[in-house]
Each structure stands twice: as structure tokens, then as C-alpha cells.
Amino acid sequence: MSVSVHETRKSRSSTGSMNISVFHKASHPDCVLAHLNTLRKHCMFTDVTLWAGDRAFPCHRAVLAASSRYFEAMFSHGLRESRDDTVNFQDNLHPEVLELLLDFAYSSRIVINEENAESLLEAGDMLQFHDVRDAAAEFLEKNLSPSNCLGMMVLSDAHQCRRLYEFSCRMSLVHFETVRQSEDFNSLSRDTLLDLISRDELETEDERVVFEAILQWVKHDLEQRKAHLPLLLRNVRLALLPSDCLKNAVSGEALLMADECTKLILDEAFRCKTKILLNDGVVTSPFARPRKAGHTLLILGGQTFMCDKIYQVDHKAKEIIPKADLPSPRKEFSASAIGCKVYVTGGRGSENGVSKDVWVYDTVHEEWSKAAPMLIARFGHGSAELENCLYVVGGHTSLAGIFPASPSVSLKQVEKYDPGDNKWTMVAPMRDGVSNAAVVSAKLKLFVFGGTSIHRDMVSKVQCFDPSENRWTIKAECPQPWRYTAAAVLGSQIFIMGGDTEYTAASAYRFDCETNQWTRIGDMTAKRMSCHAVASGNKLYVVGGYFGTQRCKTLDCYDPTSDTWNCITTVPYSLIPTAFVSTWKHLPA
């Protein structure tokens, strides 16, 4: 039954008044489209015929142009097809797929199933039926499995379906040990393989799996692919191979010794391995950077908000184990990891004095030491590792600081620490000073989300620092103003969780730092203000936080492939988490 609406309005003028009736029939567009479809099926008023294979499809140019930018351009830019009454796709398009797209153009409905989804994605992209392409991609997302995820990576990359690509890539990373044995793996392009093996999220604690996979791929088409071996080898964490495996690779693998570039790479890996075994200083080589599955999760906390202990999370055994005491208990500090070391910066001590101190915890030897102090005493700041250096961002300081500011002012100043020379330097200040912001690094840049401004307002900006240019820019607006949130990174995706308002406390979002686009993901299991998050493997872990008078007592895990949150374990009541970091495990001999 159709519904129509009459609106009566009165318009006054110097000559009197006049009634105006506005009639609106909401179902009119559907009625027109349905009748156009009837006309098409009876070949009435059609002005172009599309051919696919040996089948003809009479259509109306106006409907095609209104449904697809491809046809709009074809019929309006003086192309031959704008004058001809036929368009022949020959065998480039399956007739059944074209028929489905035309039915969609004339009805706004389409049935997608396992048999037609890939073809609809390809044809939807080719003919610029982008809604159909995206709907097919969404269908394929829901039907991803280890048996098809590599094929979906290739398909989505070819047709610019970024979300499907990321989902497919993530599943391939999770199941790498399985998918590398498939025929699809041997058919990957060099760039797709490189994207997989270069990611920290690739789930294996045995780097031999990756090493053997690239040799397998190269040998599958040796003459064409052997030139790619040096580039691929540089993205294997060679220094994490057991010593005997690294030696056997050199002595027993002729393919590796046949190329001078490859030999130089292996020599560099050997030097890095030797440095690790001798514990000879800070190891920052990409060859020694473990995958996230090979990281240890550490919680810093205490019985009050004054942090005095480090705990290790065993998320497989679902245990939280006390590890070491902090030499100097503090609150409102920041903690980040570089390699096997945790850097605890600033904060306030037991007498509320603001500190410049930097304490370093070596997870391999379970020892504390002091690094050079920061240039500015800070609390309520953020920190993140970027290219083996530590960046400290924003926060508050005391009146007696090097850069005087009242405790209520949020700092713009940003410091960089180089562990190699144990020195702090100033880099470009932020566009807007903030405290209590979420700070992470991704894709060789630093990102700062929200925070508290110098006017004590919540900030809704995404500030980004590019160290190659020493410059800050505003990348995007947050979905709402934020502070006291947590952030963690998986590839190019940054996940933001929690906040200090009723609306934000349980919410979670995904920010794509390459497209600067936001996506809402599933809410957390509880409201959390001042929670903390890290990534491990292809999952996120969130701990701590409170809302109102309620403390959050669970360690929760988020799985992006299913968009679900699950409780891993309960945090001991005596532990109030104040920081959460992910460090390298002890490196293999």
C-alpha cells in the first residue's frame, strides 16, 4: 500500500493569503524504477543494447548512467558507444553476472552467494557498481577461511577492496604456517608475499617457518624469482633463527651463496646474532625484531594508583605473575618498550613531586638501571617507540621546569630519546598541547589521539608527527572528544578504547592511519576510563581502568577477525594496572 503526504502551508503577502499544497509520495521512486524494469523486459523505449558472450540485454541509457559512473562516462564523453546503439563486452563479462548487475540497476536488489560473489566483486569494480562491489566484498569477509584467505588477498588487492584485503591478510597472518603449504601461496606476487612476511603480526614464534616459506616460494619458479630473494630475505628476522639453523643455511643452501647481495645480508645477520649472544649493547637491527606473537606482555601496577611492581601476563595459561619491584614507586608516569627493555618515564612520586627520571627494566636479565633524565619533568604524558627511539609527548610539568608552566597547562613539547647514545633531544612541538592522550606509533609516524587541552577541555583531534620532516599535522577529527583512552596498533590499524564519559567508556574504534578513516567496532565488555592496551599476535589486550566507583578487574582480548571481546582472566584485586607494555622475549640462541 502506498503512502502519500499532503502538506498545507499558508503564504501571506500584501494582497492577502494563499494556500499551497505540497504532495509527496514516498513510494514514487520505487514505482518508477519498477515500471522502468517492466519497460526494459518488454524492450519498450530502450535505446542501447549490451552484449556479453552471445546474450543481448536491451536497456535505457539513463538508467545505466544513473547507476554507474562507468556508463555515465561512456555515454557522455563523446566515445563511440555514446553514438552506437550497442555495447559489446564480448567474453570479458559473464552474461549471468551482467544480468545480475542490470537487475540491481532496475530494482536496487541483488542476491549474492558463494557461486557469484567473486564475479560480482570483479564486475562491480569494472563497471563501477561500487555498492555491489562492496556488498560482495562484505559477503566474502564473512566467508573467509584459511583455505581461501590468500586468494581473497589477491582479489581484493586487484579491486581496491581495502577492508577485505586487511581481513584476508590478517587471517593469512594468523594461519601462516598453514597457508604457506597451499598452492595459492606459491602463486602470490612478490609484493603480496612481502606484505605478509614484513608484518610484525605474522603469527609464529619460530622464524624458521618464514625463512623456509620464502625459499619455497622462490624455488617454485626459480629463474623468474631468484632476483627477489635479497629483498625477501631482508624481511626475515634472520637473527632470531637458531644459530645452527643460520649456519646450516649458509653451508647447505647453494641458492643463498649464489648471490653476492644475499651473502652480504647473511653476514649482517651473523654479526647481529653474535651481538645478541654476547649481550653486546642495544640490538636495534630489523633482523632481531621479534614478531608480536613472540612478545611478552607486562603490566605495571600496585595496590594503589602508586605503581610499585611489574607483572608478566601469560595469556595462554591465563595467569598474571609478579616479576619485579620498581626502584622508585610513582604514579601518572608513562611506560614503553624498546626491544627487551621497558622505559618508565616521569610521573609523580610519593610526595607528588614531578620527576624527570627514566628507569629502565631489562626483561632478559631482570635488572633495573637509570637512563639519562628527560629535559622536562612530566606527568600525565604519553610515550611510544618509533624506529628504536623513545618519544615522550605532552603531559603536565611543575612551575620549576626548564620550560615553566603551571600544573594546569598541557605541554606541547616533545622529547626524543636515543638509547644508543643515552641522550634526549627536543623535536618539533605538537600543534596543540595535550595531556592524558593516547599515544602510539604506526607506519613510521607518531599518532596522538584526543587528550586534555590547555583549557582543560577534551580534544577531538588526531595529531601526527613525521620524524623524517620533523613536523606535526592534524590528520583527522576523532568521532568525539576523548581523554583517558587506550590505543594499540595492528599494522596500519590503530584501535582506540575507553574514555571518561558515559558514551565513550565502553566504546572502541578502528582508525586506518593510511586513509585516516574511522570505523566503530564492537563495544568492550565493560566501561573503562584510564585503561591500557597492547597488541600481541593479531589480537588486542586491554586491562585496568575504572568507571565511577567500579574498577575493571578483567584482562580482555579483542579478536578483529570476529569483532568480539572475551575475558582472558581476572586481575588480582590487589593489582591496579597503571601501564601495559609489550616487550621482546629472550632471543633464541
UniProtKB/Swiss-Prot annotation:
<comment type="function">
    <text>Substrate-specific adapter of a BCR (BTB-CUL3-RBX1) E3 ubiquitin ligase complex involved in various processes, such as translation homeostasis and lipid synthesis. The BCR(KLHL25) ubiquitin ligase complex acts by mediating ubiquitination of hypophosphorylated EIF4EBP1 (4E-BP1): ubiquitination and subsequent degradation of hypophosphorylated EIF4EBP1 (4E-BP1) probably serves as a homeostatic mechanism to maintain translation and prevent eIF4E inhibition when eIF4E levels are low. The BCR(KLHL25) complex does not target EIF4EBP1 (4E-BP1) when it is hyperphosphorylated or associated with eIF4E.</text>
</comment>
<feature type="repeat" description="Kelch 6">
    <location>
        <begin position="539"/>
        <end position="585"/>
    </location>
</feature>
<feature type="repeat" description="Kelch 3">
    <location>
        <begin position="389"/>
        <end position="444"/>
    </location>
</feature>
<keyword id="KW-0833">Ubl conjugation pathway</keyword>
<feature type="domain" description="BACK">
    <location>
        <begin position="149"/>
        <end position="250"/>
    </location>
</feature>
<dbReference type="Pfam" id="PF07707">
    <property type="entry name" value="BACK"/>
</dbReference>
<feature type="repeat" description="Kelch 2">
    <location>
        <begin position="341"/>
        <end position="388"/>
    </location>
</feature>
<dbReference type="Pfam" id="PF00651">
    <property type="entry name" value="BTB"/>
</dbReference>
<dbReference type="InterPro" id="IPR030565">
    <property type="entry name" value="KLHL25_BTB_POZ_dom"/>
</dbReference>
<dbReference type="InterPro" id="IPR015915">
    <property type="entry name" value="Kelch-typ_b-propeller"/>
</dbReference>
<dbReference type="GO" id="GO:1990756">
    <property type="term" value="F:ubiquitin-like ligase-substrate adaptor activity"/>
</dbReference>
<feature type="repeat" description="Kelch 5">
    <location>
        <begin position="493"/>
        <end position="538"/>
    </location>
</feature>
<dbReference type="GO" id="GO:0005737">
    <property type="term" value="C:cytoplasm"/>
</dbReference>
<comment type="pathway">
    <text>Protein modification; protein ubiquitination.</text>
</comment>
<comment type="subunit">
    <text>Component of the BCR(KLHL25) E3 ubiquitin ligase complex, at least composed of CUL3, KLHL25 and RBX1.</text>
</comment>
<keyword id="KW-0677">Repeat</keyword>
<dbReference type="GO" id="GO:0032831">
    <property type="term" value="P:positive regulation of CD4-positive, CD25-positive, alpha-beta regulatory T cell differentiation"/>
</dbReference>
<dbReference type="GO" id="GO:0006511">
    <property type="term" value="P:ubiquitin-dependent protein catabolic process"/>
</dbReference>
<feature type="repeat" description="Kelch 4">
    <location>
        <begin position="446"/>
        <end position="492"/>
    </location>
</feature>
<keyword id="KW-0810">Translation regulation</keyword>
<dbReference type="InterPro" id="IPR011705">
    <property type="entry name" value="BACK"/>
</dbReference>
<protein>
    <recommendedName>
        <fullName>Kelch-like protein 25</fullName>
    </recommendedName>
</protein>
<dbReference type="InterPro" id="IPR006652">
    <property type="entry name" value="Kelch_1"/>
</dbReference>
<dbReference type="GO" id="GO:0046321">
    <property type="term" value="P:positive regulation of fatty acid oxidation"/>
</dbReference>
<dbReference type="Pfam" id="PF01344">
    <property type="entry name" value="Kelch_1"/>
</dbReference>
<dbReference type="InterPro" id="IPR017096">
    <property type="entry name" value="BTB-kelch_protein"/>
</dbReference>
<dbReference type="GO" id="GO:0016567">
    <property type="term" value="P:protein ubiquitination"/>
</dbReference>
<dbReference type="GO" id="GO:0006446">
    <property type="term" value="P:regulation of translational initiation"/>
</dbReference>
<dbReference type="InterPro" id="IPR000210">
    <property type="entry name" value="BTB/POZ_dom"/>
</dbReference>
<feature type="domain" description="BTB">
    <location>
        <begin position="46"/>
        <end position="114"/>
    </location>
</feature>
<feature type="repeat" description="Kelch 1">
    <location>
        <begin position="296"/>
        <end position="340"/>
    </location>
</feature>
<dbReference type="Pfam" id="PF24681">
    <property type="entry name" value="Kelch_KLHDC2_KLHL20_DRC7"/>
</dbReference>
<keyword id="KW-0880">Kelch repeat</keyword>
<dbReference type="GO" id="GO:0045717">
    <property type="term" value="P:negative regulation of fatty acid biosynthetic process"/>
</dbReference>
<dbReference type="InterPro" id="IPR011333">
    <property type="entry name" value="SKP1/BTB/POZ_sf"/>
</dbReference>
<dbReference type="GO" id="GO:0031463">
    <property type="term" value="C:Cul3-RING ubiquitin ligase complex"/>
</dbReference>
